[in-house]
Amino acid sequence: MTAELPPQIQNQIAQLQQIQQQIQALAMQKSQVEAMQKESKMALDELGRLADDAVVYRNVGELVIKTSKEESITKLKDREETLSLRLQSISRQEERLTSRFKQLQEQIQQALGPRAQ
């Protein structure tokens, strides 16, 4: 049936499929960022339960480094903020792509409407 479709509609269908793949990739990224956010929050909660003079270690690449509770809290809060901004960015991209997806879908349906009759 695609051989019968005009090139413009074939192109729109290809764009639609590409946008759908991008939306799926963004959903995966969003899920990963949300998981990292959850981990950071759990770590902050645990740090909150520790005494102020507690010995804290953190991973830096392949190393485990001794650090202060305050420094760990600061780094985790910075990480949470960065992840939150990333999540907002992903959500905006998702909204734009979803809007474009719906728009293309309507254009294709309108173009195919008279052919279906």
Swiss-Prot record:
UniProt keyword terms in alphabetical order: Chaperone, Cytoplasm
Pfam families: Prefoldin_2 (PF01920)
GO MF term (any one): protein folding chaperone
Disulphide linkage map: none
Cellular localization per UniProt: Cytoplasm
Keyword Cytoplasm belongs to the record: yes
Family in the record: Belongs to the prefoldin subunit beta family.
NCBIfam families, per the entry: gimC_beta
Assembly notes: Heterohexamer of two alpha and four beta subunits.
The protein's name: Prefoldin subunit beta
Organism, scientific name: Methanosarcina barkeri (strain Fusaro / DSM 804)
